[in-house]
Design a protein with these regions (language model features):
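Small-residue-biased structural context
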Residues: 1-148
Length: 148
């Protein structure tokens, strides 16, 4: 699996979790789903920031996009921390979760459809993307083993 396919799969998994969270009225269940979302996003951000973005920054025409994505990561991480610290019955929990959903979906859409991924497909060889995919998979598995 190449790097872009792996990152797309991560985006889809989180999107499914968002739908699951939005589909339940049970606040404790919603908090449980949020913790799963938090874990998925932490792993995803870590592999993007340590493996994917550094590889993409080698291409001059991608540097601004990478910087923008890193800024979005900072905002998303701050929001994750805020939500994590809220009790599930807090009146702010649902509204902050909704903002998180919107921010992450915007970030994924920007990467996949509008800007980054299409440009990467033009710039990088399939061999480079496959190699990067393997590196991302290794980093992801390492992160998940640490979390267990």
């Amino acid at each position: 699996m190449d790097a872009l396919e792996l990152l797309h799969e991560d985006h889809e998994k989180v999107k499914e979790l968002f739908e699951e969270a939005e589909g339940t009225e049970n606040q404790k269940e919603k908090k449980r789903i949020f913790e799963e979302i938090n874990s998925e996003l932490e792993t995803h951000a870590r592999i993007e920031e340590t493996v994917f973005y550094p590889a993409m920054q080698k291409h001059q025409e991608l540097k601004d996009m990478v910087r923008e994505s890193l800024e979005e990561h900072k905002q998303i991480k701050a929001l994750l921390k805020q939500i994590h610290n809220l009790k599930s019955d807090s009146e702010k929990f649902d509204s902050k979760l909704q903002v998180l959903i919107e921010d992450v979906e915007h970030h994924a859409e920007e990467e996949e459809e509008r800007k980054m991924f299409p440009k990467i497909r033009k710039i990088c060889s399939q061999e480079e993307l496959d190699k990067l995919g393997t590196e991302l998979e290794t980093a992801k598995n390492k992160k998940q083993r640490k979390a267990s």
